[in-house]
Amino acid sequence: SGASSYGKLPCVYNGIVKRTVLDEIYSRTGTFFPGPSPDMANAIALSLVVKKHCFLDYPVSWAGACVKSGGGMGAMHKHALPIEDASWLPAGCAENWETVLPHFWTAATVWAESAMKALRRMDREDLLRSKFCVESVYGRFLVYSFSDRQRIRSLLKNASLPKVAKAYISAWFSRFMAFWKNLTLTTIGRAGSFRMIKDINDVVECEKYIHNNYPIKIEKWT
């Protein structure tokens, strides 16, 4: 998928990971986060080490975002700029950027870059050749960064255009579904399994509401 999301990958970001597992990643790469986006890079690396992991259908943590975070910038459509101007990225990131990716910082490109770097540093370049779909990155880039489309024009010459078109259509569909969910949430207060709860002002009130209305019950842990 071109690292378009975490999917069901194990994650230290909003997750709990055994220290010995993290140490194995460190011993193989010299870091716990072998890529410019720590969350995606660590998730990819963990997926190559972890033998078993599980998901709890209950929030044990809350993802934070502010106007200056990547998520906040994305919500304001300010999540695109030249790599050289992304001052928070690790030193040398621009010089070592993958040549098959647009030399531009967006959610699509930095996650793909992080996944590719993690696979390389974990000595799994075979997965880059057999599994990684760079056309998925191009398709999403055309949807979310259309005004900068000239940045991938040369890359499209060596790409599978049917795969790019498929990713492009899929990204538009996902964008429409997200818009529809937000619209129904704000108008009728629900969208599928999602509910909008009003008059909650901070994370403490949120935790109390969830604890009182959806108490966790774990009868057996294996």
Q: PLM ranges: what are they?
A:
Residues 1-32, 63-66:
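Donor-binding/catalytic cores of nucleotide-activated saccharide
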Residues 32-34, 44-62:
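Catalytic donor-sugar/metal-binding loop of nucleotide-sugar-dependent glycosyltransferases
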Residues 20, 41-44, 109-113:
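A structural signal for well-ordered alpha-helical segments within the folded catalytic domains
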Residues 27, 51, 120:
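Residue-level marker of positions within ordered structural domains that often coincide
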Residues 14, 35-44:
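Conserved glycosyltransferase catalytic-site signature
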